[in-house]
A protein has these predicted regions:
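Short aromatic/basic micro-patch
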Residues: 3, 48, 219
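Structural recognition of the beta-strand scaffold that forms the well-ordered cores
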Residues: 17-19, 50-52, 95-97, 294-298
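A short acidic/small-residue loop/turn micro-motif
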Residues: 33-37, 209, 302-303
Length: 319
């Protein structure tokens, strides 16, 4: 109740879902406001939200699992899989994970929804550029390329490998690609405030979602992401030695981003939003090593960009 009161009293979210972690266990889930006002459905810990860039963490875990199985290494070069990409001989898996590959691409929306993983990859390769610059350049295309590598290494679709590596073993019942959503599922509707109307729908573009292979096309509940975090932090997805290598990098430029994790005060931070929908959907997880404590916080009506401070305050309630 303290958690919900703190969340509702904040001016960060009007509508949100939360899961709370303590000592490797989910100790609380809940929600504030409507998941879908038209259907009179309230947010709760099982409400599914679009993950946005928080999905990169899941993709990185799939890569880490393949590394643990010796099917890849952090130093494996892109040229082994996609030799036609410029500078591919000098681009490693590690650099793709950390947006240090030199690949550049804006968040673009195609005219039509892309209907297969191969179509997504083809479109991405047409739109992106590869510069040879290995400074930090954030681009979703890095994770589409990683998904393409997963496809080549395993001979399976990326969706299938994600299912086999994470979703099925962890019994995630509220995690689906946007293409698999049904009217019966508890899915959050995005909202924004327009004048006196707090229930102005803010629709996500399916065409945009279709481009975000490995980086933002999956819907997930706060409870399910908390399960993933706990499993990853306690060695259930890959050995902890590999996991710690996966989420740590030191490039000497002060930017600690590694494999979807944006570090903050030595704690792990996952964060996502959609450029065209900044006032509705946002996803965030803030957690400590070994899942000692943490908060997963998803919003479908975001009133402020200061979501991190709210997550830190909520995490302090259980740490």
């Amino acid at each position: 109740s303290t958690l919900l009161a703190s969340s509702a009293a904040s001016d960060v979210y009007k509508r949100q879902s939360v899961a709370l972690i303590k000592n490797g266990q989910i100790v609380y889930t809940g929600g504030v406001g409507d998941a879908d006002q038209g259907q009179h459905e309230a947010n709760n810990g099982e409400t599914m939200f679009p993950l946005a860039s928080a999905e990169k963490y899941l993709t990185a875990l799939v890569i880490g699992h393949l590394i643990a199985e010796h099917k890849l290494s952090f130093n494996t070069k892109l040229a082994k899989f996609f030799p036609k990409i410029d500078h591919s001989k000098g681009i490693s898996i590690r650099q793709l994970l950390d947006h240090r590959s030199g690949i550049q691409m804006d968040e673009l929306t195609p005219d039509q929804t892309l209907t297969s993983e191969q179509a997504i990859l083809d479109w991405t390769f047409e739109q992106m550029g590869s510069t040879g610059d290995h400074s930090f350049i954030y681009a979703n295309a890095n994770y589409a390329v990683l998904a393409g590598i997963v496809r080549q290494v395993t001979g399976k679709s990326f969706a299938n490998v994600l299912q086999q590596t994470i979703i099925t073993p962890l019994q995630l019942t509220h995690t689906h690609n946007f293409t698999a959503l049904t009217a019966q599922m508890p899915v959050a509707q995005g909202y924004l405030t327009a004048g006196d109307n707090d229930y102005q729908p803010d629709e996500l573009s399916n065409a945009l979602l279709s481009t975000l292979l490995g980086s933002g096309s999956v819907y997930m509940s706060a409870m399910d992401l908390a399960k993933v975090i706990i499993a990853a932090e306690t060695g259930k997805i890959m050995p902890l030695k590999v996991y710690h290598q996966l989420i740590n990098a030191n490039y000497g430029d002060g930017n600690p981003y590694a494999s979807g994790v944006m570090w903050l005060d030595d704690q792990r931070l996952l964060q996502g939003m959609y450029n065209d929908n900044p006032e509705s959907f946002s996803t965030l997880a803030y957690f400590r090593a070994d899942a000692k404590s943490g908060v997963v916080l998803f919003g479908n009506h975001t009133m402020s960009t200061d979501t991190v401070s709210l997550a830190q305050n909520l995490e302090a309630l259980v740490n």
